[in-house]
Design a protein with these regions (language model features):
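Short, amphipathic alpha-helical "recognition" segments used to contact nucleic acids or chromatin
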Residues: 1-13, 60-67
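Residue-level signal for the short linker/turn that defines the boundary of a DNA-recognition helix
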Residues: 12-14, 71, 87, 252
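K/E-rich alpha-helical interaction surfaces of small helical-bundle regulatory domains
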Residues: 17-37, 260-278
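Mobile genetic element proteins and their domesticated derivatives, centered on retroelements
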Residues: 18-22, 29, 59, 76, ...
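Basic, flexible linker segments flanking DNA-binding modules
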Residues: 26-128, 227, 281-291
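RNase H-like two-metal-ion nuclease catalytic core shared by retroviral integrases
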Residues: 48, 198-200, 206-213, 220-242, ...
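Mobile-element integrase/transposase regions
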Residues: 54, 86-150, 169-177, 181-191, ...
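C-terminal domain-tail junction helix/linker
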Residues: 57, 121, 214-218, 240-297
Length: 297
């Protein structure tokens, strides 16, 4: 109709006039006139070793194989590289989002006047550690306290302990484990040069705990009051511990819990990967720094 010539003007009817007279949107007309059977548009650039439909099973297999919950797309991308499957982070993020494989996220709060813009991590192992406690419930013995200590550089769990009583003396057990393992002996001034970050819990501020730190040569480094960010390394480990062990398993006795914690400590130290260390495990970070220190000596 738009190509038909008007008998009065001797000019063809244009598409705009025809659509206006018929009260028809031009977009609808153009959509109806589109070529049929055309292939859907493809993403530009090279496909890589795997197409999208082939890469998704690898993503699911990687998430199923890891012993941890809540790992994000960056760690999935790193584990794919270890398996010689090369792709981009943005592609992994897109596919995990499309297939609802991303870890759940919490919306952050707007920072107030107390903004923590410093850093509590270190560049060398055995410079600063963090300690904290959490609790869980056992079926036969009730509530149990869990104490642990973490290195602020490698994020390695250097000691962990479960007990029925959450006293100041029990809080020292992970520290004793770490000193024996990392410094070779439990003796006066054995951990000279190490600082320990802790909160203001009654166990950590007690006279006995502080005296034990002084005996070992460890400097006490308490976080600010009502500021858990100051002990953020230990708080992050609490979250990992809960999401991967305490919230997914039940325990009958405290001893069963203690054995499970020791097993988790080994799994975490040798399999949890850390982005800021190039997706290496805590044990790998410590080993590399120890070897570099031995060569320098």
């Amino acid at each position: 109709m738009s190509r038909t010539t008007s008998p009065s003007t001797r000019k063809p009817y244009c598409l705009v006039r025809v659509c206006r007279v018929w009260c028809l949107p031009r977009s609808t007309l153009y959509w109806q006139r589109r070529p049929k059977g055309r292939q859907p548009p493809k993403r530009p650039g090279p496909v890589g070793p795997c197409a999208d439909h082939d890469l998704v099973p690898h993503l699911k297999a990687t998430l199923a194989a890891t012993p941890f919950h809540g790992e994000g797309y960056r760690k999935v991308w790193a584990r794919l590289r270890y398996a010689d499957i090369r792709t981009s982070k943005r592609r992994v993020l897109r596919l995990m989002r499309e297939h609802q494989l991303l870890a759940p996220q919490r919306r952050g709060r707007r920072p107030g006047p107390r903004v923590h813009d410093g850093t509590i991590t270190t560049t060398r192992v055995n410079e600063m550690g963090g300690t904290d406690m959490t609790a869980t419930f056992t079926a036969a013995e009730g509530q149990a306290a869990i104490f642990f200590a973490v290195d602020h550089c490698s994020l390695e769990c250097v000691g962990i302990h479960a007990t029925k009583r959450g006293s100041r003396f029990e809080a020292l057990e992970p520290l004793r484990q770490g000193v024996r393992e990392r410094f070779g002996a439990f003796a006066p001034q054995a951990a000279q040069g190490l600082a320990l970050r802790h909160d203001h819990g009654s166990q950590y501020m007690s006279h006995d705990f502080q005296e034990e730190l002084a005996f070992l040569g460890i400097a006490s480094s308490p976080a600010f009051v009502r500021a858990p960010e100051g002990n953020g390394v230990a708080e992050r480990f609490v979250r990992i511990l809960k999401e991967n062990l305490l919230w997914v398993r039940t325990f009958n006795t405290v001893e069963e819990l203690r054995q499970a914690l020791l097993e988790f400590q080994h799994t975490y130290n040798y399999h949890w990967i850390i982005e800021r260390h190039g997706y290496k495990t805590p044990a790998q970070v410590r080993l590399e720094q120890s070897q570099a220190l031995a060569l320098a000596a």
